[in-house]
């Protein structure tokens, strides 16, 4: 069903795919704020499912709130309208950033108070509600997950509150001391990218008759604080060092987000199950980054 020839990468010129991604399959310039452009790509390639990943990350969004809304919400509206007209399914991810300080901090249930205090979070809650609206009113097959912090060796992090959990592995492989922007003891849910990609595919493949929820499912894999990931790395690099230099904006975001999510509904409704825990991810990250960086 899938494969390089069956996935079309939409991009804007300032963020054109490079390297392996550029060579992996068809790609089209496609600005999410331009509904006609989206429709042209959908028609040209006979697209039946749209993975709408266009968004500013949490820290960047706080500095450019109007642009964050334009991309995240006006863009989503365009995607949903095209999907309604051309009978496409739509996956638009939400995030742990959709929660706020009034949310229960531990094992957050699927349905609970959200009330985020960042434009990133406000836009994610709006994304969930607007996606559900299009499903109920127009029958558009919308589905989503609330992603934890995502960790990957492929793409460098940039502009997110949870980026430290990726940056720390780069420092470890390079033999550098890591300067952590998040305070000791601040737990957040995290997930390795292979699990995140699998979740995005498996949810869209799931039997719709089993889905009580749609936008958006809690999914979880691991929850740790900076000391936890430090200890995991030191099992394989005992000389690795870390110090703290807390960045106020990132810390404020982290303080308003929950420590962990309860993903029972995802497990029950579409058989979600993560494959990577902290140790398994650490082994793979260190191996893959060592090869990538030539260390």
Predicted regions and their residues:
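NAD(P)-dependent short-chain dehydrogenase/reductase
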Residues: 132-187, 193-198
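Rossmann-fold cofactor-recognition segment
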Residues: 21-34
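Conserved Rossmann-fold NAD(P)-dependent oxidoreductase catalytic core, especially the SDR/UDP-sugar
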Residues: 52, 77-119
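SDR active-site strand-loop-helix element
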Residues: 10, 50-56, 90-96, 145-147
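Active-site YXXXK catalytic motif of short-chain dehydrogenase/reductase
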Residues: 72, 120, 124
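C-terminal substrate-binding subdomain of Rossmann-fold SDR/epimerase-dehydratase oxidoreductases
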Residues: 181-183, 189-295
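Conserved glycine-rich Rossmann-like NAD(P)H-binding loop of the short-chain dehydrogenase/reductase
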Residues: 2-17
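NAD(P)H-binding glycine-rich loop region in Rossmannoid oxidoreductase-like domains
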Residues: 32-71
């Amino acid at each position: 069903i899938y494969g390089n020839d069956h996935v079309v990468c939409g991009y804007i010129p300032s963020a054109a795919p490079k390297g392996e991604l550029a060579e992996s399959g068809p790609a089209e310039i496609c600005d999410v704020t331009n509904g006609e452009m989206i429709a042209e790509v959908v028609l040209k390639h006979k697209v039946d499912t749209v993975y709408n990943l266009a968004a500013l990350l949490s820290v960047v969004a706080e500095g450019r709130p109007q642009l964050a809304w334009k991309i995240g919400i006006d863009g989503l509206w365009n995607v949903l309208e095209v999907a309604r007209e051309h009978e496409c399914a739509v996956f638009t991810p939400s995030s742990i950033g959709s929660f706020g300080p009034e949310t229960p901090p531990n094992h957050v249930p699927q349905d609970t108070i959200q009330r985020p205090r960042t434009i990133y979070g406000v836009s994610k809650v709006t994304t969930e509600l607007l996606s559900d609206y299009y499903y109920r009113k127009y029958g558009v097959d919308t589905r989503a997950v609330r992603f934890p912090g995502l960790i990957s060796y492929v793409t460098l992090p940039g502009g997110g509150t949870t980026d430290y959990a990726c940056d720390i592995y780069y420092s470890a492989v390079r033999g550098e001391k890591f300067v952590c922007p998040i305070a000791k003891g601040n737990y957040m849910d995290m997930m390795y990218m292979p699990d995140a990609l699998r979740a995005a595919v498996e949810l869209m493949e799931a039997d719709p008759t089993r889905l009580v929820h749609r936008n958006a499912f809690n999914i979880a894999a691991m929850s740790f604080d900076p000391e936890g990931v430090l200890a995991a790395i030191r099992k394989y690099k005992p000389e690795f060092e870390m110090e703290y230099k807390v960045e106020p904006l990132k810390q404020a975001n982290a303080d308003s987000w929950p420590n962990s999510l309860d993903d029972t509904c995802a497990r029950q409704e579409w058989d979600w199950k993560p494959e990577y825990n902290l140790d398994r991810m650490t082994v793979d990250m260190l191996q893959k980054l060592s090869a990538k960086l030539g260390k």
